[in-house]
């Protein structure tokens, strides 16, 4: 259960000695910066990978739901349903609107 040491070599040794509760902690400032940058880099890569996976999943789910919605609630299924109810001789006028739903009126 020891700490892993970095293999980075330092040319200038600038050390900070902190004394807390009679214990001496010696740390090198460049090593601390190197570890912080490494942690930030690893966290950034992890966050970016997670966001890309979420984007891919949402695109796939969106395509699936759009296809399913078009099949079940699309204009063709509404026309077929209306033809089955009123018979094939009924005249159907589809009024275009700028919304997601389509209004069907009989002429």
UniProtKB/Swiss-Prot annotation:
The organism of origin for this protein: Rotavirus B (isolate RVB/Human/China/ADRV/1982)
Family: Belongs to the rotavirus B NSP1-1 family.
Domain of life of the native organism: Viruses
The entry's keywords: Host membrane, Membrane, Transmembrane, Transmembrane helix
Lineage per the UniProt record: Viruses, Riboviria, Orthornavirae, Duplornaviricota, Resentoviricetes
GO CC, alphabetical: host cell membrane; membrane
Compartment(s) of residence: Host membrane
Membrane-topology annotation of the record: Single-pass membrane protein
Transmembrane segments: 39-59
Major location category of this protein: host cell
Protein name, UniProt field: Non-structural protein 1, peptide 1
């Amino acid at each position: 259960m020891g700490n892993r040491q970095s293999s980075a070599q330092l040319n200038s040794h600038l050390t900070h000695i902190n004394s807390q509760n009679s214990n001496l902690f010696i740390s090198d400032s460049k090593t601390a910066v190197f570890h912080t940058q490494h942690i930030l880099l690893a966290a950034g890569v992890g966050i970016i990978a997670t966001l890309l996976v979420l984007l891919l999943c949402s695109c796939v789910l969106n395509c699936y739901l759009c296809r399913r919605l078009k099949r079940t609630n699309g204009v063709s299924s509404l026309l077929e349903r209306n033809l089955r109810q009123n018979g094939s001789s009924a005249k159907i006028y589809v009024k275009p609107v700028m919304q997601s739903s389509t209004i069907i009126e009989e002429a």
